[in-house]
Regions:
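N-terminal auxiliary segments of SAM/dcSAM-dependent transferases
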Residues: 1-52
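Class I S-adenosyl-L-methionine
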Residues: 217-258
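A short glycine-rich, Lys/Arg-flanked "PGG" loop and its adjoining helix->strand segment in the class I
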Residues: 178-190
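Conserved SAM/SAH-binding beta-strand->alpha-helix loop
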Residues: 126
Length: 258
């Protein structure tokens, strides 16, 4: 464990508490519940191009997105990094590139599960998401930078040691998914670790098999996992109140261990 960091479990707990305080400070629980129902129908189920920007059209929806999906995606990523032994150790400061970072939780969870100090680079087209990502990195005391353009970040960054793409590719069209695959494949072949996470439903991600098939089986594995989530009580209550899963999530994963 990095001697300058508190244990990951302690920092996770403090982060989730801070997330609750941040997004319930000026809103009622019932407001966030209604917003989460609307957000789930308007964004997660449709997942059309630009869906995030249009879906987050009010304080309640932004709070629901950052709080519920932030917590669930953080814990799911953390569980996968542990199970797949993707955490970084040793000397140096490996870079974790988080593409379509949203509120920053995937890259942050990976960094938190690493013994080595890391540098997270989060890229997202949403200004709201980047604002929340910067808060996430600061709250967890992680060295990090953010960029507004995924394409420009891919072009400018040197080969990162880790690449996280969590619940992101479904927001993009085929051409943009192809650009990402073409850019990161050489990195993976040179030893970068890769963690791609998407919903398991073929209806939600009909493009998955073709996209994942671009990566050689000798380097990458495709998995499906049902992850049990130890959500904080209020997040679990929010999920149940909105008719969403509170105990587990099912995902499909493309992973390369470097």
């Amino acid at each position: 464990m990095n001697p300058n960091q508190a244990p990951a479990t302690d920092r996770t707990g403090r982060y989730l508490e801070a997330l609750l305080d941040r997004h319930l400070k000026d809103l009622k629980f019932s407001e966030v519940t209604r917003a989460l129902r609307a957000l789930s129908a308007g964004y997660v189920e449709k997942r059309e191009e630009g869906g995030l920007a249009r879906a987050l059209d009010g304080r309640g929806k932004r709070a629901a997105f950052a709080w519920y999906y932030g917590a669930t995606h953080f814990l799911a990523t953390q569980a996968l990094v542990r199970e797949l032994d993707l955490g970084f150790s040793g000397t140096g400061r490996p870079t974790i590139l988080d593409l379509g970072c949203g509120t920053g939780v995937c890259g942050a969870a990976w960094a938190l599960e690493s013994e080595a100090p890391t540098h997270v680079v989060g890229a997202d087209r949403s200004s709201f998401a980047l604002h929340e990502a910067r808060w996430t990195y600061q709250t967890l005391r992680l060295k990090a930078d953010t960029g507004r353009s995924i394409t420009e970040t891919l072009e400018s960054i040197r080969r990162p040691e880790g690449i996280a793409i969590g619940w992101t590719l479904n927001e993009l069209d085929d051409a943009k998914r192809a650009v990402i695959a073409d850019r990161i494949l050489p990195w993976v072949l040179k030893g970068s670790r890769l963690l791609v996470i998407e919903p398991v439903s073929k209806r939600v991600a009909p493009w998955w098999e073709e996209w994942a098939g671009r990566f050689p089986k000798e380097r990458c594995s495709v998995l499906e996992r049902r992850l049990r989530l130890d959500l904080p009580p209020k997040v679990a209550l929010l999920a149940r109140s909105a008719g969403l899963g509170a105990d587990a999530t099912v995902v499909r994963v493309l992973v390369a261990k470097g």
